Design a protein with these regions (language model features):
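Face-selective signature of the C-terminal outer-membrane beta-barrel domain
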Residues: 1, 23-43
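Outer-membrane beta-barrel domain signature, especially the mid-to-C-terminal portions
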Residues: 1-23, 45-66, 84-113, 127-148
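Residue-level signature of outer-membrane beta-barrel architecture
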Residues: 30-34, 46, 71, 112, ...
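Repeated loop/turn-to-beta-strand initiation elements of outer-membrane beta-barrel proteins
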Residues: 36-42, 75-80, 116-122
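Gram-negative (and chloroplast) outer-membrane scaffold detector with strong preference
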Residues: 64-82
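Short C-terminal domain-edge/linker segments immediately following a structured domain
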Residues: 72-77, 111-112, 142, 150-153
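Non-catalytic surface loops within mature trypsin-like serine protease
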Residues: 75, 85-87, 116, 126, ...
Length: 153
């Protein structure tokens, strides 16, 4: 077990605090919507985490990239797909710096607008079935999904 014993419980990472954190998030994006119904986008970003009391902003990504595409057709249908990468994350485990695996998330979805106020949707998540930690020691679900309705009031 990679945990840190604290009495009868085990934590998977150290809990630390930072009295002042400065966060600068620089992003650049390109969007394409020239074809009717088709929207494509790519966003890349860098996060600067200014910390003084810790070596790093633990478990926070320095780099992120996201690709998204949606297509609307027959007035009521929409399908889409996305890819998101979060990179350069570090965790503090038992006093040691541990480089965390990058997150690569692939999702697809579809929705149908049944009424002006009612939409039915389904979404498949983590289709690459990546076993990465959202937080150190907290593994994400494998392939999973969600289905539901959205109602506007």
């Amino acid at each position: 077990e990679n945990g840190i014993a604290t009495g009868k419980y085990t934590n998977t990472f150290d809990v630390v605090t930072e009295s002042t954190t400065h966060h600068v998030d620089v992003n650049a994006g390109l969007y394409f919507d020239y074809v009717k119904g088709l929207d494509l986008g790519v966003i890349a970003g860098y996060n600067y985490w200014g910390v003084k009391e810790n070596a790093y902003a633990w478990q926070k990504p320095s780099w992120k990239v996201e690709f998204t595409g949606t297509y609307k057709f027959l007035e009521k249908w929409e399908v889409g797909a996305s890819y998101k990468m979060l990179a350069d994350r570090k965790a503090l485990v038992a006093g040691e710096v541990v480089k965390m695996n990058d997150i690569h998330d692939v999702d697809v979805w579809a929705s149908y607008k049944a009424l002006d106020w009612l939409t039915v949707f389904i979404k498949g998540k983590n289709l690459a079935n990546q076993k990465s930690d959202t937080y150190y020691g907290y593994r994400n679900f494998g392939i999973n999904g969600i289905a539901g309705v959205t109602m506007l009031f």
